[in-house]
From Swiss-Prot:
Pfam families, per database record: Aldedh
Upper lineage: Bacteria, Pseudomonadati, Pseudomonadota, Gammaproteobacteria, Enterobacterales
Name by which UniProt lists this protein: N-succinylglutamate 5-semialdehyde dehydrogenase
Organism for this UniProt entry: Klebsiella pneumoniae subsp. pneumoniae (strain ATCC 700721 / MGH 78578)
Catalysis performed (reactions): N-succinyl-L-glutamate 5-semialdehyde + NAD(+) + H2O = N-succinyl-L-glutamate + NADH + 2 H(+)
GO terms of molecular function: succinylglutamate-semialdehyde dehydrogenase activity
Biological processes per GO annotation: arginine catabolic process to glutamate; arginine catabolic process to succinate
EC number(s) reported in the record: 1.2.1.71
Record-linked Gene3D superfamilies: Aldehyde Dehydrogenase, Chain A, domain 1, Aldehyde Dehydrogenase, Chain A, domain 2
Function: Catalyzes the NAD-dependent reduction of succinylglutamate semialdehyde into succinylglutamate.
Family: Belongs to the aldehyde dehydrogenase family. AstD subfamily.
Active site: 243, 277
Length: 492
């Protein structure tokens, strides 16, 4: 039973597909995709459930969402294993993802009240009130790199606001999506409030093309995000929240504590096998002996990063990529850069045929002309050398993306300048690019997206504001506008 529609598990009528553990190649899920008719049924179920769900007191919706958080806590070990086996990420990282899902609930409840609750202002003759109302039926598209945490950042605030949801996980992580929905089912969500449709591109296009959805919340690649934007063009009545990729720069201007800088760089570039949208893709290093020493140390430490299975002991820093195809694609990107004139500082190696185990790669791109401005979603780091800080900022901004940017330097003045000139939604100073706080916005500008998903700021796009001028009584004003004449005794 692949799909959950209107409170019932049912098989899909679309093509069958399966997902393997990308390292040991064991099948972890198999089922069928939803066909277009079943997608329409899921949207219809969400539409039917919307009025009663939206009318529930907020406290009642909150209670169900908090029950979901409690079930996450109780099922943490099991869900960690599901996410780890399906994505290839190490146990410690999969467990951290589940913890982030749990923490998201309390933050989302607070964000609802602070950002989208009711606000009242007294007026001389009444009051002004700001309220927020749910959009209706929202489609949520989940990515594969954080198959629990990132969709959760859309679904939790959407449900708290009173929306109903049709959720399509990535076709590369169907088991994680199913496991999370089963916890929502146990939490007591009414039938139709949350629906699950599995499948790939055809299922996704059927969902985004549904006339009866009121919006679409997406986290994933820029290629897919741009396609969705085109598909929904001319429909301003629908909310479209896109959080996409990045070609993110990390500027190493003054690496004084070399090992600390190397550690930060590895955390920025290679965590999650480079499969975070905020990962550093471009390392900008000042020319000179200090930069040379830093790069030498970075290569030395990075070549010790040997990926292994999600449940390997001792636990590795890196697991596998999401699939063998993903690992091959990153390896091909390295070969293309070498063919274009890049100098390999650390060669990425495919460790075992048929698996997704890929070691990190580092290539010096300083002398390569006409570099394609695309996100390589994996552990491949390009290096560019520069002479002046002005040149570094220009290199950092030489991208159509605008997700994250970082500076390693003891000089606050340089960070202040970067804050003014960087074109990115996240700008960090002596902190990894991959670090994020749930109370801060997460997202970018340009080709990186148009909204800020996750907890605090997700509340903004999960409800629309309603303004009211209110008075319990109505009396004729003592002073009338020019041209109005109400003579006493004329009214009958």
């Amino acid at each position: 039973m692949s799909l959950w529609i209107n409170g019932e598990w049912r098989p899909g009528r679309g093509p069958g597909f399966s997902k393997q553990d990308p390292v040991n190649l064991k099948v972890v899920w198999q089922g069928e995709a939803a066909d277009a008719g079943q997608v329409a049924e899921a949207v219809a179920a969400a539409r039917q459930a919307f009025p009663s769900w939206a009318r529930l007191p907020f406290a009642a919706r909150q209670a169900i969402v908090e029950k979901f958080a409690a079930l996450l806590e109780a099922s943490k070990a099991e869900l960690t294993a599901v996410i780890g086996a399906e994505t290839g990420k190490p146990r410690w990282e999969a467990a951290g993802e589940v913890t982030a899902m749990i923490n998201k609930v309390a933050i989302s409840v607070k964000a609802y009240h602070v950002r989208t609750g009711e606000q009242h202002s007294d007026l001389p003759d009444g009051a002004a009130t700001l309220r927020h109302r749910p959009h209706g039926v929202l489609a949520v598209f989940g990515p594969y790199n954080f198959p629990g945490h990132l969709p959760n950042g859309h679904i939790v605030p959407a449900l708290l606001a009173g929306n109903t949801v049709v959720f399509k996980p990535s076709e590369l992580t169907p088991r994680s999506g199913e496991a999370v929905v089963k916890l929502w089912q146990q939490a007591g969500l009414p039938a139709g409030v949350l629906n699950l449709v599995q499948g790939g591109r055809e299922t996704g296009e059927a969902l985004s093309g549904q006339a009866d959805i009121d919006g679409l919340l997406f986290t994933g690649s820029s290629t897919t995000g741009f396609h969705l934007h085109r598909q929904l063009a001319g429909q301003p009545q629908k909310i479209l929240a896109l959080e996409m990729g990045g070609n993110n720069p990390l500027i190493v201007d003054d690496p004084r504590d070399v090992d600390a800088v190397v550690h930060l760089t590895i955390q920025s570039a290679f965590i999650t096998a480079g499969q975070r949208c905020t990962c550093a893709r471009r390392l900008l290093v000042r020319r000179g002996e200090a930069g040379d020493a830093f790069l030498s140390r970075l290569v030395t430490v990075s070549q010790r990063l040997i990926p292994a299975a999600w449940d390997a002991e001792p636990q590795p820093f890196l697991g596998g990529l999401i699939s063998e195809q993903a690992a091959q694609k990153v390896h091909q990107a390295w070969l293309q850069r070498v063919a274009a004139g890049a100098v390999t500082l650390l060669e990425p190696r495919l460790l075992q045929a048929g698996t997704s185990l890929l070691t990190p790669g580092i290539v010096d791109m300083s002398d390569v002309a006409n570099v394609e401005d695309e996100e390589v979603f994996g552990p491949l780091l390009g290096v560019w050398r520069y002479d002046t800080f002005e040149e570094a900022i220009a290199l950092a901004n030489a991208t159509r993306f605008g997700l994250s940017c970082g500076l390693i330097s003891p000089e606050r003045e340089k960070f202040d300048r970067l804050l003014l000139e960087a074109r990115a939604g996240i700008v960090n100073w002596n902190k990894p690019l991959t670090g994020a706080a749930s109370t801060a916005p997460f997202g970018g500008t340009g080709a990186s997206g148009n909204h800020r998903p996750g907890a605090w700021y997700a509340a903004d796009y999960c409800a629309w504001p309603m303004a009211s001028l209110e008075s319990p009584t109505l009396t004729l004003p003592a002073s009338l506008s020019p041209g109005l004449d109400f003579l006493a005794g004329e009214a009958s």
